[in-house]
UniProtKB/Swiss-Prot annotation:
Signal peptide feature range: none
Primary gene name: proA
PROSITE patterns with a match to the protein in the record: PROA
Protein name per the record: Gamma-glutamyl phosphate reductase
Gene Ontology biological-process entries: L-proline biosynthetic process
Pathway in which the depicted protein is active: Amino-acid biosynthesis; L-proline biosynthesis; L-glutamate 5-semialdehyde from L-glutamate: step 2/2
Length: 416
């Protein structure tokens, strides 16, 4: 029996045990986990410091180190997120529909747990607890495989959760942690059809592509965000400037940060020079521009074709000039990762056309792409942002981690 077989078998057994937990029992456990995270902050920070030291030694960028860092405030924020999940309405057992058919059968469709969820993710250690809390709230067991960069932080966080489960008399195997960060073990998890009911990868383009190519278990893709801001010819340019600055610079290392700027030719001469001046007062951003934009920006560099398809996760932004709304939409649909896209315009009909025609999970009018988030959307914590057109699209909250089951009651009916 392999390492993943052992974890998978334990998770499968645990999933059957926790499937019967009541809402009250689940909420009480989540609140206990939240308390334990705060109480164990020193331990978690000590383990996180090991990852931070390794990151510094390995030359990981400051932006990526910030994703990795855990402080008392950030741990308190993670704990608050767990409490918020406890406060969310429990979807398990909810009736999706119910009716009596022509044969007199009473048919009810209810939400039920998936069973065992596996998650492969990178860098951000808070994901481990976010994922556990959502899985547990929906009566699912979860297997977590984090990245090498955050191995000590993730292990510490999961250790705290497992201890809280044990103290509550609930099987600690409701959350499993894969300590082996090798690609071989990750790929074994991707094909563990005997145990895993759903796999959610959360990370960069390379991880997502590897999972798409090698997984044999059901997968929901998340994450990669080549997000665009299109500044229309009817845009309020002051508003557009603030939206671009926020979407690019507030937190560039996350998947809902803007990576590409598309500007209508009619306003480009006024907008781009002013945007460049405004943004550089706040943050040094490297603009990689097409030929027309390059002539209007003092510090821009020429863009390569690859730049328009890149999720930079850094203070870098590609710039494209277009001659029409249709061209903007076609351009975005060519390069989008179907995450979050935005238009800035005062023309309602053009805004509606953009929202209808752009193929993305979240399409904004006159707002930053940075709002694509489970809490902001009122879904609570998210396990990821789905860029597929499956049952789950956009921020994945509790309902995305459920399946449905038909309950049929009869009185001796047979089919003629």
């Amino acid at each position: 029996m392999t390492y993943i077989d052992t974890l998978g078998q334990q998770a499968k057994v645990a999933s059957r045990q926790i499937a019967k937990l009541s809402t009250a029992a689940k909420n009480d456990l989540l609140n206990q986990v939240a308390k334990a995270l705060v109480a164990e902050s020193d331990y978690i920070i000590t383990e996180n410091a090991k990852d931070m030291a390794n990151a510094s030694e390995n030359g990981i960028s400051k932006i990526m180190q910030d994703r990795l860092l855990l402080t008392e405030d950030r741990i308190a924020g993670i704990a608050e997120g767990v409490r918020q999940v406890a406060d969310l309405q429990d979807p398990i057992g909810q009736v999706v529909r119910g009716y009596t058919n022509l044969d007199g059968l009473k048919i009810v469709q209810k939400r039920v747990p998936m069973g065992v969820i596996a998650m492969i993710f990178e860098s951000r250690p808070n994901v481990s607890i976010d994922a556990f809390s959502l899985a547990f709230k929906t009566n699912n067991a979860i297997i977590l495989r984090g990245g090498r960069d955050a191995i000590n932080s993730n292990k510490a966080l999961v250790t705290v959760a497992r201890k809280a489960l044990k103290n509550a008399g609930i099987t600690a195997d409701a959350v499993q942690f894969v300590e082996d960060t090798s690609h071989e073990v990750a790929e074994e998890l991707m094909v563990a059809t005997k145990y895993v009911d759903l796999l959610i990868p959360r990370g960069g383009a390379r991880l997502i592509q590897t999972v798409k190519e090698k997984a044999k278990v059901p997968v929901i893709e998340t994450g990669v965000g080549n997000c665009h801001i299109y500044v229309d010819k009817y845009a309020n340019l002051d508003m557009a400037t603030q939206i671009v600055i926020n979407a690019k610079t507030q937190r560039p290392s996350v998947c809902n940060a803007a990576e590409s700027l598309v500007v209508h030719a009619d306003i480009v001469e006024e907008f781009l020079p002013n945007l460049e001046k405004a943004i550089l007062k706040i943050q040094s951003v490297e603009f990689r521009a097409d030929e027309r934009a390059l002539k209007l920006m003092e510090k821009a560099v020429p863009a390569s074709p690859e730049d328009f398809a890149t999720e930079f996760l850094d203070y870098i932004m590609s710039v494209k000039v277009v001659d029409s709304l249709d061209e903007a939409i076609n351009w975005i649909n060519t390069y989008t990762t179907s995450h979050s896209e935005a238009i800035v315009t005062q023309d309602i009909s053009r805004a509606e056309q953009f929202q209808d025609d752009v193929d993305a999970a979240a399409v904004y009018v006159n707002a930053s792409t940075r709002f694509t988030d489970g809490f902001v959307f009122g879904l609570g914590a998210e396990i990821g942002i789905s860029t597929q057109k499956m049952h789950a699209r956009g921020p994945m909250g509790l309902e995305a981690l459920t399946s449905t089951k038909f309950y049929i009651n009869g009185q001796g009916q047979i089919r003629e």
